[in-house]
Amino acid sequence: MELEMAALRERMLPSGFRFNPTPQEAVTYTLPRLIAGEPLHPAVRPYIHDTDIYACEPGVLAAQFQPTPRTGDRFFFTSCKRQPQKAGKSTRAVRAGGPGSWHSQGNSADVKDGSGVKIGEVKKLRYKKGGKFTDWLMDEFSCCSEDAVVGDRQRVLCKMYVSPRAAPDSAARQEDAAAAAAVFAPPAPEKPVAAHKRPAPSIAEQPCPQTAAT
């Protein structure tokens, strides 16, 4: 099943193309362009979904939004509400997620440029529902641009995925596989036409172009 899904995903992007931005690429290129409304590569933009990721649980998001080919990750351009804490301390984002919530796994990691200057942050989160942690994970990328903050909202780029350590029968892995199968399922074969019902062509038909093997 996994190999079939990977093969189908390979056909969704141009040969050799892969969308899996590093933290530096996410906070210096992808996210700033999304915030500014500037175009991204036409093969990439359809896989960055503009939605409130914190309004739904990850299984619902997986069913509604297709993953990125070759990696199976899902990317979302969204915003999170910032809530000020005590004076002298940083702010934290409020991250509800439908009936559950996203919980940070440790402190945010600074993203720095080649000169060591901070240019953004990446926070690791894990989804918790019914008092138990699931195998849905998320990386939340934020940049230092002033345009990223609008009122009490912080605009971020999120990468949602299933933990590589998830068991084959985990709920998250099953939700992800079911959603991917629905999105990438090949079309049903057409019913064969009976020979006596197909009229003979008056002129020779051109042969169908052969699709190059991938």
Region spans (language model):
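Short amphipathic alpha-helices and their capping/turn residues within compact interaction modules
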Residues: 31, 35-36, 143-146, 162
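Short, flexible loop/turn elements at secondary-structure junctions
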Residues: 81, 129-131, 142, 161-164
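Structural scaffold elements adjacent to functional motifs in cytosolic proteins
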Residues: 1-133, 150-151
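Intrinsically disordered, low-complexity acidic/polar and Pro/Ser/Thr-rich regulatory regions
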Residues: 2-15, 146-214
